[in-house]
Amino acid sequence: MKKKTPIKPQLTEPVTSDFYLEDEMMFEGLSASNLDYSYLTCNNLILRDTKLERITMQKTRLERFECSNVLFKNCDFSNLEWLAGSFHQVWFDQCKLIGTNFAESFLRDCTFSNCVATFASFSNTNLKTVDFSDCQLVDSEFYEINWKQLTLTKNKLTGSNWFRTPLNGLDFTTNTFDKIALSQEHMTGLIVNQEQALTIAAGLGLVIV
């Protein structure tokens, strides 16, 4: 099957305007930068056709969040709770996603490039045409994800958890890890290089001589 690449956000000169967190708000055609909304909670926030740059939302909780055709650039979303969110045609570029929780979210046509996502959780997510490239995904969670057209390129995957995730057709070869958690019954069809195969085998308790 030919690999598809995510559709990047198509933004036509978003208007610089105020951005803030408030329940039931929808922002469309917006550009905002250099704002801090950490330690807040917001429900049913919607972003469309928007660019957010250097926005900080540490330990913020966004419930039932929805965004489409959005660029997040140089943002700090460390420990942000994005549970059960919806992300369509979204690009995270050079963002800090340390401990960010995407659990149970739906992501389609999403790109993560040059992000620091150590301890981030994508557990129980639905990923369709999603690309991670040059990201730090150390100790990240990809537990029991449902994926189609997932691409991983030059990421650091040491300590990442892929338990109960079917891996048939997933290509790890350009990524690096010295330990990784996989379910043996779901490893059929996983594409790895020789060094990675030895690392995985050692993790399963095999003694290689």
Regions found by a protein language model. Give the residues of each.
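Tandem repeat scaffolds
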Residues: 3-209
